[in-house]
Amino acid sequence: MKIKGVVRDDDSIIFYKNDEVFIYMTRKTKWGGRVYGQIYNANDELLLKVKSFLWLGIKITYQNLGLPISNVSFYLYDRFALGKKDKLEILNLLIYCRLYWNNACIADVKPINLLKYNTHLEINFNTKDELKIYYSTILFCTTVLYADLY
């Protein structure tokens, strides 16, 4: 399963599944390097609100996902606890990322079409579990708050 992401001119990031909008994030920058993001599903339902100050970490300030999520963020690594038994870890290796669900690699993220004006990403999932794809895409979205902003 491939999910494609595009950073648009209005600073939003849209993720497409089968060429249809799957998840999108609007972003606002504030003075001093703060970035606020709101993540929505294809039905325009607000799923998460996040804020960050430069690369010091991401804080989830609102969630509407049906299960509690907590996170720990570092510069190259993000870890999310989903409910009581699952965890998602995102390892950022410069322009490539790898997603781990309960210590098993479920996806690689890489930039594509580097010669185009906007940044294009591709998440290559090696799982068919729709819930893992859904939650992983939403939480990966929180880690790209700064993509193409500076």
Residue ranges and their predicted role:
Residues 1-150:
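Intrinsically disordered, low-complexity proline/glycine-rich segments
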